[in-house]
Design a protein with these regions (language model features):
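Bacterial N-terminal signal peptides that target proteins for export
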Residues: 1-12
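Residue-level micro-sites within transmembrane alpha helices that shape
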Residues: 6-7, 20, 172
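GH16 jelly-roll
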Residues: 28-287
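Sec/Tat signal peptide C-region and signal peptidase I cleavage site
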Residues: 23-26
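Bacterial N-terminal signal peptides
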Residues: 11-21
C-alpha cells in the first residue's frame, strides 16, 4: 500500500455493508462502537477559521493549497475505478462563478505518458504537503453529480504511515446508483474496507442543490453531519492506534471517481458531468 494516497476496499463493498432496506440505513457497528448518530452538529463557539478556499480567484485550483494526485494513473486506481486523474486542466477542474467544478468526461488522453488505458478523465485534488490538520471542524459546501457510475467524495487520509494504519475519514461518499443517499465512514486497522464504521443518510436533494457536509473531529470522537444535523459518529474507545490513529495530521481530498466498487456500471450518456464545490473551510480551537 502506498503511503497515504491509496486505499483498498474489502471484498464486500460499503453498499453491502450498510444494508439499505425500506428507507433505513443500518449502522455498520454495534451501539457504543460508533455508527448512526442524531441531533444537531454545530461548530463550537470558540473555534476560529484556520484554512479555507472560497474558489473565487483565478481560473484553476490554487496550487498553493491543492496538489493534483495522479500517482496511480499508469497502473490503475484501486477499487476498480475507471478514471484517469489529470493534472492542471480546465476541462477537468476549473473555477467558475466562485465555485470549483470538477468535471468527469468520456475521453481517453492517449498522449499522456502516464495514461493507463482509461476511457474517462476527472480530477483528484489533495492538500498533502500544503495543509494538514489534527482535530477541527470541517465544512464543505457542495452539489453532487447524479449519474449512473459517478462516485464523488470528500475525505481525509493520514499523512504519517500507510493505510489503513494512518486512518481515513470519509466525510462524504455518494454513488450515482443510489442518488438519494450519502455516506460517512471511518477506516482504521481495526475496521476498514467493508468493515469500516459509519452510517448513511437519505438526502433526496443531494444532486439537486448545495448542502453543507460537516465533520467535527475532537480527541474524544468524530461526528459527521449534513446541514447541521449529525448522522454518524466514531468514538475514541481508548484501545490504541489500531482503533484511534486520529491524534495525528490528516490531509483533505476532493475527487470524482468513475465506476469501481461503489460507482458501479457506467452510463456513458451522463458525460460530461460536474461536481461543484462552493467552499472548503477548516476551523480549530486556537485558545
Amino acid at each position: 500500500m502506498k503511503q497515504g494516497l491509496t486505499r483498498h476496499w474489502a471484498a464486500v463493498p460499503l453498499m453491502a455493508a450498510l444494508a439499505i432496506d425500506g428507507g433505513t440505513a443500518l449502522a455498520q457497528t454495534a451501539t457504543g462502537k460508533g455508527g448512526a448518530a442524531s441531533g444537531p452538529l454545530a461548530m463550537p463557539a470558540d473555534y476560529t477559521l484556520v484554512w479555507s478556499d472560497e474558489f473565487d480567484k483565478g481560473a484553476l485550483p490554487d496550487e498553493s493549497k491543492w496538489a493534483y494526485d495522479t500517482g496511480m494513473n499508469k497502473q490503475g486506481w484501486h477499487n476498480r475505478e475507471k478514471q484517469y486523474y489529470s493534472g492542471p486542466r480546465a476541462e477537468n477542474a476549473a473555477l467558475k462563478d466562485g465555485r470549483l467544478v470538477i468535471t468527469a468526461r468520456k475521453e481517453a488522453l492517449t498522449t499522456q505518458a502516464d495514461w493507463g488505458g482509461q476511457q474517462y478523465t476527472s480530477t483528484r485534488l489533495i492538500t498533502k504537503g500544503k495543509a494538514e490538520w489534527t482535530y477541527g471542524f470541517f465544512e464543505i459546501r457542495a452539489k453532487l453529480p447524479c449519474g449512473q457510475g459517478t462516485w464523488p467524495a470528500i475525505w481525509t487520509l493520514g499523512s504519517q504511515g500507510d493505510w489503513p494504519a494512518s486512518g481515513e475519514l470519509d466525510i462524504l461518499e455518494h454513488m450515482g446508483q443510489k442518488p438519494d443517499w450519502v455516506f460517512s465512514t471511518v477506516h482504521t486497522t481495526s475496521g476498514h474496507g467493508g468493515h469500516g464504521v459509519g452510517d448513511g443518510r437519505k438526502l433526496a436533494t443531494a444532486c439537486g442543490g448545495f448542502h453543507n457536509y460537516q465533520m467535527l473531529w475532537t480527541p474524544k470522537e468524530i461526528r459527521f453531519g449534513i446541514d447541521g444535523q449529525a448522522h454518524a459518529v466514531y468514538p475514541n474507545l481508548g484501545k490504541g492506534t489500531a482503533q484511534w490513529p486520529f491524534d495525528k495530521p490528516q490531509f483533505l481530498i476532493l475527487n470524482l471517481a468513475i465506476g469501481g466498487d461503489l460507482g458501479g456500471e457506467v452510463d456513458d450518456r451522463i458525460f460530461p458531468i460536474g461536481y461543484e464545490i462552493d467552499y472548503v473551510r477548516v476551523y480549530q480551537d486556537k485558545r
